[in-house]
Amino acid sequence: MDCKENGVGDASGCNIDANSLASNLAMNTNEDFYEKLSSRGQNLDSVSSLEIPQTASSVNHTIEGQRKCFTEIEQMGYGNSNSQEDAGNTDDDLYVCYNADDTQEQGVVSGELEQSQELICDTDLLVNCNKLDDGKESQDTNVSLVSIFSGSMQEKEAPQAKEDEGYGGTTLPIGGSGIDTESTFVNDAPEQFESLETTKHIKPDEVESDGISYRFDDGGKEGRNGPSSDLDTGSSDDISLSQSFSFPDSLLDSSVFGCSATESYLEDAIDIEGNGTIVVSPSLAITEMLNNDDGGLCSHDLNKITVTETINPDLKLVREDRLDTDLSVMNEKMLKNHVGDSSSESAVAALSMNNGMAADLRAENFSQSSPIDEKTLDMEANSPITDSSLIWNFPLNFGSGGIEVCNPENAVEPLRIVDDNGRIGGEVASASGSDFCEAGMSSSRRKARDGKQCKVVQTKTSARHLRKSSRKKQSERDIESIFKCSKQKRSSLLKTSRSSEWGLPSKTTEIFLQSNNIPYDGPPHHEPQRSQGNLNNGEHNRSSHNGNVEGSNRNIQASSGSCLRLKVKFGKSGGQNPLNITVSKVSGNSLPGNGIVKAGTCLELPGSAHFGEDKMQTVETKEDLVEKSNPVEKVSYLQSSDSMRDKKYNQDAGGLCRKVGGDVLDDDPHLSSIRMVEECERATGTQSLDAETSPDSEVINSVPDSIVNIEHKEGLHHGFFSTPEDVVKKNRVLEKEDELRASKSPSENGSHLIPNAKKAKHPKSKSNGTKKGKSKFSESAKDGRKNESHEGVEQRKSLNTSMGRDDSDYPEVGRIESHKTTGALLDADIGKTSATYGTISSDVTHGEMVVDVTIEDSYSTESAWVRCDDCFKWRRIPASVVGSIDESSRWICMNNSDKRFADCSKSQEMSNEEINEELGIGQDEADAYDCDAAKRGKEKEQKSKRLTGKQKACFKAIKTNQFLHRNRKSQTIDEIMVCHCKPSPDGRLGCGEECLNRMLNIECLQGTCPAGDLCSNQQFQKRKYVKFERFQSGKKGYGLRLLEDVREGQFLIEYVGEVLDMQSYETRQKEYAFKGQKHFYFMTLNGNEVIDAGAKGNLGRFINHSCEPNCRTEKWMVNGEICVGIFSMQDLKKGQELTFDYNYVRVFGAAAKKCYCGSSHCRGYIGGDPLNGDVIIQSDSDEEYPELVILDDDESGEGILGATSRTFTDDADEQMPQSFEKVNGYKDLAPDNTQTQSSVSVKLPEREIPPPLLQPTEVLKELSSGISITAVQQEVPAEKKTKSTSPTSSSLSRMSPGGTNSDKTTKHGSGEDKKILPRPRPRMKTSRSSESSKRDKGGIYPGVNKAQVIPVNKLQQQPIKSKGSEKVSPSIETFEGKLNELLDAVGGISKRRDSAKGYLKLLLLTAASRGTDEEGIYSNRDLSMILDALLKTKSKSVLVDIINKNGPFAGMESFKDSVLSFTEHDDYTVHNIARSFRDRWIPKHFRKPWRINREERSESMRSPINRRFRASQEPRYDHQSPRPAEPAASVTSSKAATPETASVSEGYSEPNSGLPETNGRKRKSRWDQPSKTKEQRIMTILSQQTDETNGNQDVQDDLPPGFSSPCTDVPDAITAQPQQKFLSRLPVSYGIPLSIVHQFGSPGKEDPTTWSVAPGMPFYPFPPLPPVSHGEFFAKRNVRACSSSMGNLTYSNEILPATPVTDSTAPTRKRELFSSDIGTTYFRQQKQSVPPWLRNNGGEKTANSPIPGNLTLEKKLNS
């Protein structure tokens, strides 16, 4: 059988006799074995080789070598040594052969292994020992690995070895697969080898196509499975272990093994072509040897293979499969690059056997451990192994030295001589923690060099490392516990060689791409290119220190997956846990075998065009890069020529990884990142945080401040992101011009992906920016032992690297600057975010890093802002979805992926200023952008309106009303109204006009009417509707027109729908407004219920409104339920449209809609209450998106409904009624920039209209005035027009009916912040100032305000009166127009001088008009609006004026009587409003004036007063003086107060109906204009009384009218009224300290000086107070006037003789005086007339001595 046919990669194996190939081989793990090995001084360093197919003649080629390498391996069994040493061993030639007997007992096997009865495969290890001789460059000599199985596998039903008689050899099955077609053939060489036997005690635990993993059972402990390896050459997929064999002399003489004890370099093997096979202990890890691109054999070249197979503790080898396993390409590459291969034909044949069989791209990783005592290793436990590819430690010595295989590439530590102390040339070769189980690998980016040059550099680098190494002692530790690193469950399935393409990586890739709709062109085919040499020679290995070799960091071995994985280490671990990012294997030939990014050395993302072949080498130098102002680390780049293959691999290599990762991130970047982290954590197991002491340490980062490089696609070339501290950002990164400078790179290299925040804006988003993250670094002292490459480098701050590329291939330099960076890991192509955002702290000087990363939502790392097309609020969206939103698409909040803000009712996340500040956008820039966006979006919005406006109205047809809140009523037989009609004898219909039920609007119930079936009064029940059809009625939407003639009064149809209660109605109304409902379907059913025909109804819902209707609505009682029927008001012809007046059945507070009825008496709006309506629909009915304008007080534009309208300024003329031309013919003056939809535009001087200040949240509206130009120019000065604060420019010059008195008009317009909504004209839309009404004085023109949302209850109506104005109905002219003249901005009565009089006149006329039939409909509605305006009035002066205002002549009703009469009004709304006003403002004792004659009557004295106000402000009916005719400084006498002249308050007098007062003089001081508090000085009681009576100082405007003004709010002051008689209703009893009073009362919450519950506890002093003389008492009172515990007493009504009181101690306190008249009737039991302290026995007056009331205070004291 030919070797080629059996897939043997090495033809030399055919010359070996299988009978002498092997002997019994077993591994003894007990202590005696290693003690003997140590006693011999044997220590074997690592051995590795790349397997390259060789010709058969290579074995026969013999050249005399300098030395011969002999191997001795002892095998112990049951404590006895069965090893045999060759007697011919010498110092130079040591020949060791392990001969085993034919039985298991002769093999050296431990007891534990024998009990386990496990079988282990035999292995042949090929060693290539090359030596440099006298500076000659060696040529790679290729050796091969022959995989065989021992014959003992037959016992486990393994495939039997087949002997080929023709060749005299033995063919052994590969991998134990049981398939005999592919096997390894070994020629017989009986003269060179001894007998081959196997043992039964060792069996394979796992044999897979990727390799084998096995387990040693020692003491019941199972070692870890090491990762299996794939043979890239395809020669064999399995690794087997051979027990023992002897070395032939021909091989030993061929100088294949240069294992001298004195030399540490490789032999020169230029003239040597030979293969050798050496048997090693199973504790050695067998590495598959792969060739590099040029065919050179370099054992250190592991950049393309990093598959791990760890057999602890002797061996640590880490390897990751390279994914570029296109064997056809590899075969071609090997043939071209192989040097000295005289029989490449056989190599091709050998490789062709496995064409189509790629290595498994998702190879599982295994590790194996063997419990070996620490003492046998003789090494320190804490010393980390830093070799990143493989470090093998053998307890055997070759003479006095060892073998060293240098590795100049990728900072991979070479194999070195290991002395007795476990040191490699002065460096500790042992490892601690998990690093001993898994060695760090070299970066996958590094490229192998030519064999000649790499050996030169390899030798020099190795020597330098030997000199610079530091020494460390290792603490003793239980190696058994240390080596337990892997906690993963390994697979135990046996994999055979694939016989079909199914399951192959290429096939899997194709299926995967096809399932994701990704084009697939097959695996790439390209010509191999020779890598370029390392120009820096050995400088790249400078970064090791502290005895650690660079690259010792532990790698995160990803299991299987198809996405970018992040392994994030949390917590503190002494600065030794850098960020670890693992790129998992992806099916296909696009990723490198080294799919692991080494933490602390390389940060790689799958953004490269060809991730596997693109190898850029990063070397730290001292002179490559210097920044001007920022001292940063000098970095240079070396780029391999293979990086030029990007163009070929864009579609397959990098693209596949990006597609795989991007598809996952597209779904949910946040969840995917968490998922990736979790998978990585599961792959690596639970890791300890202590890198030095724990066996499960995550990473031992020995690379100080190592460089992080990143590959990305051709567009960005090979940008460089400095150090692991920099969290990478690659796409859509905002960089400020003043912070970042781009590298010298053409714009096509990706500079367009870095937009500037101040210039580049997406049409729909505020910015394509990111939320700025900060990288924070901890600073520490410089390490004295740091590497020389870091000398002079200052501690780095947060670094942000701009990407760039030089024109040359290498070196490629990226500019590093010290700036804040964004913590987002992005894919270079699709901008997906890996959702890693956090802060990184780093000890830069030591190169040790601690990564504290927090996983956040993707929108926090990189986000943009987009405005909702419905609510116009700005929402945050991921920047990756910005590209999907263009100008033609419509975006609403429901499309937001962030569910927190996926509803228009949700408030904006941030204010506009904060958004602009976050994005670095200035206000002017934002305004300009909004204006530009408005212009761009106008056409799109109008187009979308036309498209959706054609949609038909959808509703559910029902026949009767549906009650949602209750069940339908049904009448009993006793409740049914039965008419007295009799059936007609001639068969005519009964129940005509004379029917009693018909007269009462009650339908006769079927079955109860005497007329029976001939009853005509059952129209609702029988649904006797007329015939009509639905049609499109222009701007009014759908309408209903007749298909037959109709007589007057005929029943047309019932208006049916859903019956809602008031609460449900309000909710439904807001819901419709929120959704943009534009049609009006509400109808009042009764006082508590409303019909909504919007969602459900019949054809009656399509009847439109008209201010001159031809139908009317009537309410009928049908079986106990009220039904609304529509009846004709006149004779109607066929084809005539049916209309009725919506206002008759208007729901109070319903939304107002623009009326398009076109009648001569059109009121302009339908059904809306302008005082407190929520929304006014401004758009036409045929527009699909109603123009909703929020009318509320919320200045931020986020009102109750959360819906605004975006109005633009070009179509005002189109949507204006024809009356626009009638406004004095000034249509041509409307400027283009101030036109507004549905508004009358008037051009004002340019200087008065500054540019609009627009915010992104508010609606973009530039509003104009709709007033008469003549009136503006004639009556309002230009300088005063700019001071107007009215939301509509109508208030700029609000004109009186006669159009005169410009001063009055200007004052009203500028000082009262009146917002007027003209009902006969289209409503003016403008903005409301953000300041209060008082601050608005002197403001700028309102149309240019920032706030663009109109509060509805702030908008009032003002008719535009001019000779050219259209005619309005009398009811509008008399009521609505005049009412609007009287109202202010908040809907209350304005403060103008004539407002009170006009309001009372309007109220009187409206109340009087309710008796007429024509105006009765409007009177009830108008009365409710008048009273509602009164409730909204907040000005005290206005309310007082209205209350005090009398009729124009005697006998006219007063306001009080009018309001009291309205409490018994028939209309429910008027009744409730009047009662509400009465209960709030009119006390009960004023409702019945005759009751105030009774002083102690409980109805009047203990009436419930509004608890918001101080009880002391309650009017007093006893001993109160009327308001004097003129104020006086001092009054010597006072008029006696009478109950008839009792006033509502001290400041004014309310005349009784029986005694009207004709004096209409107003007070000097107004309630809303409090006078200044007079300076506290010595005053008389009369002067205080005068001030109290006339001044009413310190009046609080929030107090109601009709009550006395409060005193100045002084903390310790109390209010008291001295009275001659005790009044039980007074709040404070005499003599009680304030602290005690507070215990019996409840002070007001808003005002501590007021009482919520006034104390009323009577004072009964017991025992009586001690006596005191009058003079002494008052002397002390005068001195302590301000410090008395009672506080200051305020006297308001009682006029007493002058008594000077000095109040100099506390000027803020009111004067405190004493009066003996208080409490004279307090003690009713004793009828005392003097205060208790005056009732003394030693005084001149006794307790029973009365004090006349007409005596002054001095006379009382001196009597």
UniProtKB/Swiss-Prot annotation:
Induction comment: Not regulated by vernalization.
Q: Which regions are flagged for Low complexity bias? A: 1284-1293
Q: Report biased composition (Basic residues) as residue ranges.
A: 462-472, 758-775, 1317-1326
Look up the signal peptide feature and give its range. Answer: none
Q: Where is the composition biased (Polar residues)?
A: 530-556, 1232-1241, 1530-1556, 1581-1594
Tissue expression remark: Ubiquitous, with higher levels in young tissues, including shoot and root apex. Expressed in ovules, tapetum layer and microspores.
Broad enzyme group: transferase
GO biological processes:
anther development; carotenoid metabolic process; embryo sac development; epigenetic regulation of gene expression; methylation; negative regulation of flower development; plant ovule development; pollen development
Per its UniProt record, what PROSITE patterns does this chain match? AWS, POST_SET, SET, ZF_CW
- Assign the protein's first listed, main location to one coarse class: nucleus
Q: Where is the SET domain?
A: 1026-1143
User: Binding residues for Zn(2+), per the UniProt record?
Assistant: 868, 871, 893, 904
Task: Determine the domain of life of the protein's source.
Answer: Eukaryota
Q: Where is the composition biased (Basic and acidic residues)?
A: 154-165, 197-206, 215-224, 776-797, 804-816, 1304-1316, 1511-1521, 1566-1577
Location comes to:
Nucleus; Chromosome, Centromere
Q: Which family does it belong to?
A: Belongs to the class V-like SAM-binding methyltransferase superfamily. Histone-lysine methyltransferase family. SET2 subfamily.
Q: How does it assemble?
A: Interacts with FRI and SUF4, two components of the transcription activator complex FRI-C, and with SWC6, a component of the SWR1 chromatin-remodeling complex. Interacts with BZR2/BES1 and IWS1.
**Main function:** Histone methyltransferase involved in di and tri-methylation of 'Lys-36' of histone H3 (H3K36me2 and H3K36me3). Binds to H3 already mono- or di-methylated on 'Lys-4'(H3K4me1 or H3K4me2), but not to H3K4me3. H3K4me and H3K36me represent specific tags for epigenetic transcriptional activation. Positively regulates FLC transcription to prevent early flowering transition. Required for flowering transition in response to vernalization and for the maintenance of FLC expression in late embryos, but dispensable for the initial reactivation in early embryos during reprogramming.
PANTHER family xref list:
SET DOMAIN PROTEINS
**Protein name, per record:** Histone-lysine N-methyltransferase ASHH2
Q: What is the species of this protein?
A: Arabidopsis thaliana (Mouse-ear cress)
Q: Which gene is annotated as encoding this protein in its UniProt record?
A: ASHH2
